[in-house]
């Protein structure tokens, strides 16, 4: 047994298990000794910050909502920590996107015992990824359509009511109020983007994360890679996008906040298309950052796109 643990992999695995188990014990002990524990708020844990914000708007002050991934994090290939296991295990409900977004989550969830979960994209009609190794698989960035966000709201409301029925009235009321705010987003966004001439409406980005936004507002989508993964901005991908930009005289290209802007800037340099700046999609910023909420993320992204096209 000692010889086997000389393997670096096994030593790391053993250390991970010990740390996670110790943390769980410590957390449980603190809960036992805390007399106010029985009065604690219903706790929701989400896989990333956008779901956290939507859920907190519905939960209001009767539940606490935390995200496993931090603001600004790359969420596709996130590496969970023992602390994340403790956080999830202490939850009353876990909310996740599904559609192959959190490729780490299903394995992670195997470590969590007796905590219910809900997929917040249930009922959304997926748009398939068009090309590359993920061709035909559902594009997971469904929240980039405000109309889809209404489905997120309803799924989260149902999950909260099911698992915390004592506060059903609050959840129902807050969900309705927040849905009205989301509905109010569409008209001004549509009017702003409609100023861009139809022949110019090509949305060129690094990751193919804007399919739902592009469909809603009449853009053709071009991207350097379909989903943030190991191969980003390889020569064949870059050349393909450069050819499309030149052929269609596309005036502007963008990158995303959680990845390097170098590939997009390379394309801009080689084609003469303007580099339009950073779009936000996978993660919110901190409270003092530019996109601390889902609504601000949508507004900021559309504003950046419109300005990139001179609108």
From Swiss-Prot:
There is a second metal binding site (site 2) involving Glu-162 and His-163 which can bind Mn(2+) or Zn(2+). It is unclear what its physiological function is but may participate in protein-protein interactions with other metal- binding proteins. This is Iron-binding protein YfeA. GO terms for cellular component: periplasmic space. Pfam families: ZnuA (PF01297). The gene is yfeA. CDD domains: PsaA. Residues 1-31 form the signal peptide. Transmembrane segments: none annotated. Its main location: periplasm. The keyword Phosphoprotein does not apply. It comes from Yersinia pestis. Monomer.
